[in-house]
Amino acid sequence: GIIYPSDFIPLFERNGKICKLDLYVFTEVCRLISHWEKNGKEAVPVSVNLSRQHFTDEDFLEQFADIAQQYHIPAGMIEFELTESIFFENHQINRVGDAIKRMHELGFACSLDDFGSGFSSLGLLKEFDVDSIKLDRSFFLNMSGQKARDVIACLVDLAKRLKVKTVAEGIEDWGTVEYLRSIGCNMVQGYVFAGPL
């Protein structure tokens, strides 16, 4: 049967294999982008998750850069998704900031995933130079009230002021898509278009 990430990722984090898994996924993404481009297909930017365990090694990004170079991946084609949990380890805060700068130097984008699911999201936006925020699906579960819509509109407006793109996660209906379009949300993902690939 299907094994979901919520089942196997904690196991890989406990047994120390999560960094190898991230590198494997990254390599496969690079291979696919290269394959698409060689076959005349337009490649689209792809987001990959990055475990907080990578941040214990100051030079971890060089390995990712070497793989991207091996596959001739153009700058801007790969975005690293960071979750709020990466920022909770106080001794790693400086490393995370330095790593985000290095990501940009190497041609990678960086997003803050599941934005709004924790308590420190706004503070993170102030401190770290991310390219986009991915608004957590919990924002969109009950949008019948004006207050919920106002919160989302304020977040999108704040992101625009900071020159950060917004991505709405977990969208399941066209009414929400139209609302997000009307307030200027940059991108939408969810079952309204397709299931996970």
Q: Regions from the language model: what does each represent?
A:
Residues 1, 51-58, 70, 77-91, ...:
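EAL-family c-di-GMP phosphodiesterase catalytic domain
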